[in-house]
């Protein structure tokens, strides 16, 4: 077991010292009660039954009942407080892991699967709870009882105790042999389980596509393949565990049988009393059960320890911190400038997306961006939001290099509406005020009216307080986009970024909404990426992007005359 990992876990347990003291006292009480019962048995046999002293029998039974009561009460406190500590500790770990994850760089999520994240924050952390309970409760209890029972066995009979001690190294051999193999299998089992979680997440996020293409049978077969892979690791691990358990039981009970055989001979010879052998066998059984329990726990520790290791990697991967950010100059009219910017995604290192791009946009302007798929249009927005950092060149906001500014401060200036509207489970209203939870009811109602939400919300039973389901499953694509736009406008941004934000609306609705947006954003900047020319036809000027660079710019009329690429895009849409 990795001591460093356990030390890290101990850091989360330190703030629950009082609870842990109660757990330790309870553990010692449980162990002491069980061990004392052995000496009571010896007195019962030697002084009570053998000499026919009924009072000794009564006293022994009374002591046993008293010890059982202490055992029961102590067991209650042990179980309650250790599980309570485990729940509080894992909640703190879960919160810390979640807080770290949510502050990762965006590009790091390209390498992570959502299912793997979910699995780590749920299944892995549940395994850590098991680790806390098993180690602080059962492992320590069994260790105390093992040491105590062996010590008492030596007091009863040195010879018989030595026989029992010999069995421990015999049990250590298979534990060491199988341990490394089980650790590898545990890691693979957790990784395989994460793949299952990813598959489930992906399947039900795309359930409509699966139905539309009749892919249910294919998805079931694919899921079954992943399930069988997971099962193989689990079965192999369980076989090793079962084999070790069988070996442990055999060795322990053979040792007890040998003790009984030799002990019976010593009773006949008068070297031991009947009470001593009964007491010794009782301690031997406790030692055997405790030893078996310890080895069983050690063989099972690999899974939760691996889970802890996976969570610690999340917690230790702290976001890049900068303490020397410049103060954002927000007194001048808003402006944006790209100077010779290059960019390549880490996940696609051989494909340059932005190539020596330069552009400038000042306040009170509406900039449209067009280009073919993969030209780099959306990447412009991603860079402006500081989701990624450019390789070369400079991006300026208000003539300040954005790499020297706090990303959170930059994003306060911006409202972003992606093509696939980000809708959270909850109500229409809760999704809108996500953009500005300090907005007044009058401001919310005004935005709802402008974006056309009022019209469809009025048909719902609870209006804007209607539940819309996970990811807005009860809404149409156009309704989701209206909510996303309302959220952005409620933020009162200086820069509004629209990435195919009205693609689900008809042309008439789009134009009406666009006019409202332009009025609200007067004096600020609108950047709109569009495949549909009607979305940016009224822009002050339009950039045509191809192969990561600006190949033409101007008004719609200018580009219709002077840009072959722009004319082709317009012609293709007219053909459609």
From Swiss-Prot:
InterPro entries, per database record: AAA+_ATPase, ABC1_TM_dom, ABC1_TM_sf, ABC_transporter-like_ATP-bd, ABC_transporter-like_CS, P-loop_NTPase, Type_1_exporter
GO molecular function terms listed in the Swiss-Prot or TrEMBL record: ABC-type oligopeptide transporter activity; ATP binding; ATP hydrolysis activity
Membrane topology: Multi-pass membrane protein
Subcellular location: Cell inner membrane
This protein's UniProt keywords: ATP-binding, Cell inner membrane, Cell membrane, Membrane, Nucleotide-binding, Translocase, Transmembrane, Transmembrane helix, Transport
Enzyme class, spelled out: translocase
Domain of life per record: Bacteria
Enzyme Commission code(s) on record: 7.-.-.-
Transmembrane segments: 21-41, 57-77, 135-155, 158-178, 242-262, 277-297
Binding site for ATP: 371-378
Cross-referenced Gene3D superfamilies: ABC transporter type 1, transmembrane domain (1.20.1560.10), P-loop containing nucleotide triphosphate hydrolases (3.40.50.300)
Pfam families, per database record: ABC_membrane (PF00664), ABC_tran (PF00005)
Major localization class: membrane
Gene Ontology CC annotations of this record: plasma membrane
PROSITE patterns for this protein: ABC_TM1F, ABC_TRANSPORTER_1, ABC_TRANSPORTER_2
Domain ABC transporter: 336-572
Domain ABC transmembrane type-1: 20-303
Free-text comment on this protein's domains from its UniProt entry: The ATP-binding domain (NBD) and the transmembrane domain (TMD) are fused.
Role played: Part of an ABC transporter complex. Transmembrane domains (TMD) form a pore in the inner membrane and the ATP-binding domain (NBD) is responsible for energy generation.
Similarity comment: Belongs to the ABC transporter superfamily.
Record's subunit section: Homodimer.
PANTHER family listed in its UniProt record: ATP-BINDING CASSETTE SUB-FAMILY B MEMBER 10, MITOCHONDRIAL, ATP-DEPENDENT PERMEASE MDL1, MITOCHONDRIAL
UniProt protein name: Putative export ATP-binding/permease protein RC1073
Organism encoding this protein: Rickettsia conorii (strain ATCC VR-613 / Malish 7)
Lineage: Bacteria, Pseudomonadati, Pseudomonadota, Alphaproteobacteria, Rickettsiales
């Amino acid at each position: 077991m990795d001591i460093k990992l356990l030390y890290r876990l101990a850091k989360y347990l330190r703030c629950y010292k009082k609870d842990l003291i109660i757990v330790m006292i309870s553990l010692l009480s449980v162990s002491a009660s069980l061990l004392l019962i052995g000496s009571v048995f010896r007195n019962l046999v030697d002084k009570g039954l053998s000499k026919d002293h009924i009072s000794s029998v009564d006293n022994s039974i009374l002591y046993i009942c008293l010890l059982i009561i202490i055992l029961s009460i102590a067991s209650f406190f042990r179980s309650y407080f250790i599980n309570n500590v485990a729940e509080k500790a894992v909640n703190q770990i879960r919160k810390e892991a979640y807080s770290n994850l949510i502050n990762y760089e965006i590009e790091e999520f390209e390498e992570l699967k959502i299912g793997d994240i979910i699995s780590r924050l749920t299944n892995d952390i549940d395994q850590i709870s098991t680790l806390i309970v098993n180690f602080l409760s059962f492992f320590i209890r069994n260790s105390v009882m093992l040491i105590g029972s062996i010590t008492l066995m030596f007091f009863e009979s040195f010879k018989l105790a030595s026989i029992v001690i010999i069995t421990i190294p015999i049990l250590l051999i298979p534990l060491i042999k199988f341990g490394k193999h089980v650790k590898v299998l545990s890691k693979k089992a957790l990784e395989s389980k994460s793949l299952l979680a990813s598959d489930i997440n992906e399947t039900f996020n795309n359930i409509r596509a699966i139905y539309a293409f009749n892919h249910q049978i294919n998805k079931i077969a694919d899921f079954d393949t992943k399930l069988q892979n997971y099962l193989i690791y689990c079965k192999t691990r369980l076989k090793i565990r079962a084999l070790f358990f069988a070996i442990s039981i055999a060795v322990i009970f053979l040792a007890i049988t040998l003790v009984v055989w030799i002990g019976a001979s010593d009773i006949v010879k008068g070297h031991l009393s009947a009470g001593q052998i009964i007491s010794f066998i009782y301690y031997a059984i406790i030692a055997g059960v405790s030893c078996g329990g310890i080895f069983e726990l050690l063989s099972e520790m690999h899974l939760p320890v691996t889970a802890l290791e996976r969570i610690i990697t999340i917690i230790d991967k702290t976001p890049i911190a900068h303490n020397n950010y410049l103060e954002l100059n927000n007194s001048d009219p808003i402006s944006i400038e790209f100077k010779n910017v290059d960019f390549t995604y880490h996940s696609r290192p051989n494909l340059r997306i932005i190539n020596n791009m330069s552009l400038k946009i000042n306040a009170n302007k509406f900039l449209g961006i067009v280009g073919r798929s993969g030209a780099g249009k959306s990447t412009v927005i991603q860079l402006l939001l500081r989701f990624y950092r450019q390789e070369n060149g400079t991006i300026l906001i208000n003539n300040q290099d954005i790499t020297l500014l706090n990303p959170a401060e930059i994003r306060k200036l911006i409202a972003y509406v992606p093509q696939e509207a980000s809708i959270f489970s909850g109500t229409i209203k809760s999704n809108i005020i996500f953009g500005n939870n300090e907005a007044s009811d009058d401001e919310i109602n005004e935005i709802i009216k402008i974006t056309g939400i009022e019209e469809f919300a009025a048909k719902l039973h609870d209006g804007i307080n209607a539940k819309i389901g996970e990811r807005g499953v009860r809404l149409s694509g156009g309704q989701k986009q209206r909510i996303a736009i309302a959220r952005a406008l409620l933020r009162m941004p200086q820069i509004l970024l629209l990435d195919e934000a009205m693609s689900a609306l008809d042309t008439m609705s789009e134009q009406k909404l666009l006019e409202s947006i332009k009025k609200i954003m007067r004096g600020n900047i609108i950047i709109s990426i569009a495949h549909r020319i009607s979305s940016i036809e009224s822009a002050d000027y339009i950039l045509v992007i191809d192969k990561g660079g600006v190949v033409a710019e101007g008004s719609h009329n200018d580009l219709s005359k002077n840009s072959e690429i722009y004319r082709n895009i317009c012609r293709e849409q007219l053909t459609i």
